[in-house]
Each structure stands twice: as C-alpha cells, then as structure tokens.
UniProtKB/Swiss-Prot annotation:
Localization (cell): Protein storage vacuole
UniProt lineage: Eukaryota, Viridiplantae, Streptophyta, Embryophyta, Tracheophyta
Binding partners and assembly: Hexamer; each subunit is composed of an acidic and a basic chain derived from a single precursor and linked by a disulfide bond.
Tissue-specificity statement: Accumulates in seeds 8 days after anthesis.
A Pfam family that the UniProt record links to this protein: Cupin_1
Signal peptide extent: 1-24
Stated family: Belongs to the 11S seed storage protein (globulins) family.
Organism (species): Arabidopsis thaliana (Mouse-ear cress)
Cysteines paired by S-S bonds: 30-63, 106-276
Function: Seed storage protein.
GO MF annotation, one: nutrient reservoir activity
Residues bearing PTM Phosphothreonine: 109, 395, 420
Domain Cupin type-1: 35-229, 282-431
One GO cellular component, as annotated: protein storage vacuole
Name of protein: 12S seed storage protein CRB
Length: 455
C-alpha cells in the first residue's frame, strides 16, 4: 500500500511540475502583439531550380503551426520524389507542368497503350510497357492536396519557370513528430542541409537510400551492388531539382481544349471515384466558379472538404482572392482556423487587430510576401495597385469567416438597442452603422468621402 501511495505521489508531483512548466511556456507561445510580412530565410539551390524556405520557428508561424516553402522549377527541371511528415496544400503561382504522386498501397493505374502512349521513353526494350501511378497536368491556379507520407514529384514541361508555394500543417495529427518540417528524399540530395532544424548540426542531407548498406538494397531490389550505389546519389551534387536532358516520357492523359475558351483540362481515366485515384487538385483561378464575384471589384473562391473531399483527411482548406484597385475586403475574422496569406501579385494595404483591440499589422504587403492571420484576429484588405491577388491556406477543412460590416455581418445581426447603448450613438447613427453597407464581402473603398476621425 505504501508503495502504491509513493507511486501516486510521485506521479502527481510530475504532473504538477509539467503543468507548471507548460504554464510558463504557453503564455509566450502565441504573444502576437506585432506581426510582420515574412520573407524566405533560406534558399536551397539545385541544378534545375531552387527551394525557398520560411523560418517556421518565427513566432507567428510557430503559433499557427504552418511551415511554408516556395519552389522555382526551371524549364525541363524535375523536382525529385519527396514526402513530408505533415499534410500540405500546394498552389501553382506561375507556369505549367506535370505532377505525380505515389499513394502507399495503391497499384499503377497509368499504363502504356495505343491510347496513352505519347512520349514513350527512348531505348526501352521491345515489348516492354511502363506503368505507374497517376500523373496530372498543372496550370496556374491549381491547388493540390497532399497527405503526409505521400511521395510527390513535379516536372516543368513549359517554357517559363514553374513557381509553386506550399503550406504544411505541422500542428495537425498527420504529423507524429516534432514541429519541424522534415522532407524525406526518395532521390537526389540537399548539399546545403536543413538549416531550419534547430539543434541539428548543419550537414548535407542525403536521400533515404543512402542510409542502407548497398548489399541490402541490392537484395531488396534484386539488382547488382553498383546499381544500388547509384540509388544512393552519393556522388551526385545536382540537388533536389535536376535538369532533364532530352524528352521526358511519362504516361499521362492528353489535354483537350475546354469549352467556351476555357483552360485546357485532362480527359478523365474513369477511375477518379476510387480511393487510390481520389481527386487531389482543384483550380481556383476561374472567376466563373467563384463564390463571390463582382466585375468591378474582383472575386473570391474557396476550397474546402465539400468540393475537394481529400481535405477532410488533411484538415486544411484554401481561399483565392483577386481584387481590383480601390476594392476592399470588408473587415472579417477566421472563426475556426489560422491562416497563412501569400501574395501572388500586386500590392495591398492590410490592417489587423488582435483580441486586445490593438492594431498588430498596418502595412503594405506585396508579391512574394507571407502574412499569418491568427484565429479571431480581424483583418481588412485594401488593394492599392491595379490588382491584388493572394492565396490563403487555413488550418480547418471547412474554415469559416465572420464579417464586422455588411449584409451578413455580426453588426447586422445585433438589435439596434444593443448598438445604440453599446457605442453611445443615436438610433439614426445606429441604423446607418447596421444597414449602410449592403455588400457581403467586397466593396469600393474611397475613404476621403467619409471624412476624417475626430482628434
């Protein structure tokens, strides 16, 4: 009995110490009293392009749980197969290309045949037909959902750089490790190492085959030891993105021109309803599919688990916005998600307010910059260039927003008596506050016509 009491006492002591430690650490975890537009902190150069990495240990990224990267793949550049320890959403900012992914346990569904035999590789043995998992065509505006542990590759088959941005959710249950972004390389290497991993000595990052003995690889693949050593890329300094010499012969569906002048799209292979070939890509750059559209102002499109069911697994969603000069997104906050806002084109003036009613961001933000929008923080966007375009990644598969002004806003839902007494204004002023803005999301902005604040 005494032994049991001692164990219980010891356990309670540990629990108290742990809670005390957590209480000391947690207050500093999300003290977001000053936010900044973020730039990449590390550039990883390769033969066929570069990877730009944001420091996810920065307070606002650490609090939101996001890790953020930008990939620039030059023409004929191949981003070699890699998987992550977290689910991610990738957005095509510029260019076009091909993308393939390998879902664990799924069979090859793309096979060479008279229908899908375009661009077959050179030097293949007579009668040999390749087969592999799904390959997709990519274009600007495509948003790609990738679960953790799924190997993925990209190829630029265009004449301009293929630019992608990716947000990984390190705080989700897809990540069973620490809050470090860990790319696992199937092929290639990273001569510069992973500077963003705290506490790890800087050294070259090799692919996962490098850690196995060549003899073991030879037995596993039933190949000779020399070929096994080639898999390890030990003498290869091209990096994660390599240049492809000559034709890139992979099996993929042909493109057909969309109706009414729309962007080309793939011919379906008839298997999209199965788990192994479930749809993971949605294009957000078509205004005709937008959730909010006004020709004079712009459009906003959302992507969630209702229109892309794989997002239920990732617990992520996205929002694409494009607004014209002097258009404004009415002040709003994310109800159930953090967001990472990346500017793809143009400039805007953004103000953000925290739970203390303090303005924590009041700056211009421009193309290539990243801004974290924490849950509950109210934010206003005002385009100051000819056009402002952005993509937001959110940490909920069905992220919701609420607005401060407009037809569906919190103010519209309050009784006039609450507004008059809460702000000490007349009933007439309360009516103007509640009913003057008839838009729901986008409005024109001409602040000088409304006068200046009292000193």
């Amino acid at each position: 009995m005494g032994r049991v009491s001692s164990i219980i006492s010891f356990s309670l002591t540990l629990l108290i110490l742990f809670n005390g430690y957590t209480a000391q650490q947690w207050p500093n975890e999300c003290q977001l009293d000053q936010l900044n537009a973020l730039e990449p902190s590390q550039i990883i150069k390769s033969e066929g392009g570069r990877i730009e990495v944001w420091d996810h240990h920065a307070p606002q990224l650490r609090c939101s749980g996001f890790a953020f990267e930008r990939f620039v793949i030059e023409p004929q550049g191949l981003f070699l197969p890699t998987f992550l320890n977290a689910g991610k959403l990738t957005f095509v900012v510029h260019g076009r290309g091909l993308m393939g992914r390998v879902i664990p346990g799924c069979a090859e569904t793309f096979m060479e045949s008279p229908v899908f035999g375009e661009g077959q590789g050179q030097g293949q043995s007579q009668g040999f037909r390749d087969m592999h998992q799904k390959v997709e065509h990519l274009r600007c505006g495509d948003t790609i959902a990738t679960p953790s542990g799924v190997a993925q590759w990209f190829y630029n088959n265009g004449n301009e750089p293929l630019i992608l941005v990716a947000a990984a959710d390190l705080a989700s249950n897809q990540n069973q490790l620490d809050r470090n972004l860990r790319p696992f390389l199937i092929a290639g290497n990273n001569p510069q190492g992973q500077e963003w991993l705290q506490g790890r000595k800087q050294q070259k990052q090799n692919n996962i085959f490098n850690g196995f003995a060549p003899e073991i690889l030879a037995q596993a693949f039933k190949i000779n030891v020399e070929t096994a050593q080639q898999l390890q890329n030990q003498q290869d300094n091209r990096g994660n993105i390599v240049k492809v010499n000559g034709p890139f012969g992979v099996i993929r569906p042909p493109l057909r021109r969309g109706e009414g002048g729309q962007q080309p799209h793939e011919i379906a292979n008839g298997l999209e309803e199965t788990l192994c070939t479930m749809r993971c890509t949605e294009n957000l750059d078509d205004p005709s599919d937008a959730d909010v559209y006004k020709p004079s102002l712009g459009y906003i499109s959302t992507l969630n688990s209702y229109n892309l069911p794989i997002l239920r697994l990732l617990r992520l969603s996205a929002l694409r916005g494009s607004i014209r000069k002097n258009a404004m997104v009415l002040p709003q906050w994310n109800v159930n998600a953090n967001a990472a806002l990346y500017v793809t084109n143009g400039k805007a003036h953004i103000q953000m307010v925290n739970d203390n009613g303090e303005r924590v961001f009041d700056q211009e933000i421009s193309s290539g910059q990243l801004l974290v929008v924490p849950q509950g923080f109210s934010v206003m966007k005002h385009a100051i260039g000819e056009q402002f375009e952005w993509i937001e990644f959110k940490t909920n598969e069905n992220a919701q927003v609420n607005t401060l002004a407009g037809r569906t806003s919190v103010m519209r839902g309050l009784p006039l008596e609450v507004i008059t007494n809460g702000y000490q204004i007349s009933p007439e002023e309360a009516k103007r506050v509640k009913f003057s803005t008839i838009e729901t999301t986008l409005t024109h902005s001409s602040p000088m016509s409304y006068g200046r604040p009292r000193a």
